[in-house]
């Protein structure tokens, strides 16, 4: 009875061991090119694909005679052969290893081999695990290229074999490893000290540096004294660098680091090295809509404003003048050491066409050029050197109002003018067209003095008075009250357009270029002259009579 029970128990164990999915131990009996023969003590030897016995490097990891665990796929496949799987056995072993690591909070080794939504995939001895993006490191990591393909340690934080779900954390391993080192570092860390670290992550605003359990931020503005567009210009992930501790907040465990502070500040005493007016060469490092930046020495850049790029083109885009990388000659215009700003000039290193014009032209010189534009206030004429001169509306014609005179011109016309004034500093040249001829108004006044009797033709008349053309380009004005010795309320009653008149020149308005006229004053003057003439004749008659009487008396008559 006892033997029967023992026999039955042993047979039941064998049944369990030979069920599909069971893990059995076998011996490698042969290794062929494509298969490995394994004897697991079953009905027949099993041929297993050789690929299932290769490691990650593609090397066969067994020899003939080695014992290996394999999974039983089928006791008999219909051809009398037993089907075994080394791959499934490996997977079973991997799950056992993961369960043990999970229970004991131990680390496991794996390789990050892909990116998925929310994180990454990790290969753990044939088991695919999920690594959340937030658990890659103690700091957020955007780029994992430096980690992919490398064997790393992880902790299993979630395990469900039935659902084939494994979640791991690299952050937990780092925090655990860095705990002791971190405590020691925090205890010794002081502001001003120099420390070594490894760049572990880059952002648009800087780089995070692992100091050994503690991360410090190397801000982009503290990487170099020069302008830095992106941290990758200075450091790369994985670089080992020496930095200076600028600020350490022990309570919040925040460390600010500096790289440029390891060297001397190039801005110190820069005004002494480059006095205003100094000419030097530099390299164009950046272009903007408002100018370009030029590096004049390592870590020192100045701005050439767009207005200081060209003497004649004020609104030209910097890209039309220079390119990034160009070596250019510039002049120091201004230095603000406190604000760390240098104003540079590009055009100041070239000949100033305004100054050249001032040196080669005098007031009254005749110039010629094409009309470049016509505005509400005058005409711009293109001159040698790419500069413009302005003919103001008031300097177009002696006789015609500027608004009317300008209509006779159009863009592109060749035109002559006279230089009236040159202000090289303000970059202004005043020209005149009417000055090409003599001023008829001044000529008229030089010939006709105040008080003279002049003649003219009425060109316009209203109640208040009449406008009189005295000569070509010369006007006079006769007020109604000056039109007659009689009281006149309305000039139209005594004058009409076209009337020829004779009047006295009584005054001049040089600003408005008008001669004041008076018929009344002329008539009064004429009357006075007539009276004087009569009186003279009477006096002459009386004198003649007196002489005759005296002559008679002398004869004794």
Swiss-Prot record:
Binds mRNA; thus facilitating recognition of the initiation point. It is needed to translate mRNA with a short Shine-Dalgarno (SD) purine-rich sequence. Belongs to the bacterial ribosomal protein bS1 family. The gene is rpsA. It comes from Dickeya dadantii (strain 3937) (Erwinia chrysanthemi (strain 3937)). It comes from the Bacteria. GO terms for molecular function: mRNA binding; structural constituent of ribosome. This is Small ribosomal subunit protein bS1. The lineage of its organism: Bacteria, Pseudomonadati, Pseudomonadota, Gammaproteobacteria, Enterobacterales. Disulfide bonds: none annotated. GO terms for cellular component: cytosolic small ribosomal subunit. One of its GO terms (biological process) is translation. Keywords: Repeat, Ribonucleoprotein, Ribosomal protein, RNA-binding. Residues 21-87, 105-171, 192-260, 277-347, 364-434, 451-520 form the S1 motif domain. PANTHER family: 30S RIBOSOMAL PROTEIN S1 (PTHR10724), SMALL RIBOSOMAL SUBUNIT PROTEIN BS1C (PTHR10724:SF7).
